[in-house]
């Protein structure tokens, strides 16, 4: 096989991609991603020792975080960026070793290859990336748990980076990420120890989502109930996709007064819920649906597109928008223009704005409105109304349907599930999974919409806060006693950290779909079923009947 990757839900045949990624990444990029993670594990070993000696490097924390983010599904397809990052990682690792030596400390003997391997040429890097020791091909329980931890830490890194971009950091989160990475190449650890580390990963997942929630709300205000337009205006526009709100803010500031409108796409939709962005009259609305429909929607948008994070889908060779796509941050694709920070940490979007002015206005693909903004602060403000609806029987059950969307036909399950839920139920959602049902006419219960959108995938934290608040209000001992069921759709590694966070909070009986992760060995899957009641999804009618009988 020329590659092996099973980190996302669309792994080929439910087993793994071996020639080219279903996501579109080449075998070369896949192998380089694996090698970068390998190098990051080596850096983590050295950084852990340096931390003990008081000579750890802050730039190493950031480097590891950024490097992990680059390897998340649909973030970066540019092999040159990975080669550059690997070279920089080796150099940084050796600098940490030198700092340890200068401090009179010694690294452990018999360091693993990840902490000692070096290369100076692109050829040497490519050669190493094809090595069997780099790939996660084994499916025994130990390796399965290692991959589960790595993917959780990747999701953690993404959320940590968004918070850091806004000036909010937690050194304990960096230290844990490095501890966890190093542990995944420690052959002395037992299955029980790795299971404990998996739950600890979930605990820090809660912490990092709380940190990002704090960063977003203290910077941009608490999300509030908001109506978002789905139509278009006659001005040229820029479409911004991804999750990074700082990038959005900079783009809005720089486009103000230019005659160029700004539209959100996919996971950027919830930005409309934040008070700070409502002052921008040219922040028009949302264009399109979930990430996997971008090839068609980008053609009709006409203007340039800015990717701040995933999910980027490689465009067709003859796509009319190929020369209009810009990337920034961890995102990359060969031939796309990449916007970097200057020395002051600012980004210059003048080129994308200039190009937008030469483009036709977006073509209308739909009309109407969406309502969202039901993050924890807003829902808790409405707590009396919600509690009364539950006590009166108007609301029988809540369904947490957070997570990701994807292109596989079996994801129609989530639309059908939402449509067939009893009228006395309410959906709590976050992430792009919402696009399977947020435009369905599901109505409301006494003025409470039957779909309450908290925001982006990281705002699954809000759903947990809401659940814990309801537990308190109803005087319950266990969050699982609430009339809340969990039917989560996953796709990539941020969904993994959300899942682990829910488990760390004690949530049980989560249904995960549309398929279970390929990286879960039968033994590990069995433990998740036995200890936490994790289950897959089946027929819509059967699943609803099972949920409603609890």
Swiss-Prot record:
Binding site residues for [4Fe-4S] cluster: 5, 8, 17, 23
Pfam families for this protein: Prismane
Required co-factors: [4Fe-4S] cluster; hybrid [4Fe-2O-2S] cluster
Keyword Metal-binding belongs to the record: yes
Cofactor binding note of this UniProt entry: Binds 1 [4Fe-4S] cluster. Binds 1 hybrid [4Fe-2O-2S] cluster.
Subcellular location: Cytoplasm
Source taxon at top rank: Bacteria
Reactions mediated catalytically: A + NH4(+) + H2O = hydroxylamine + AH2 + H(+)
NCBIfam families the UniProt entry points to: hybrid_clust, PRK05290.1
Family named by the database record: Belongs to the HCP family.
Protein's name according to its UniProt entry: Hydroxylamine reductase
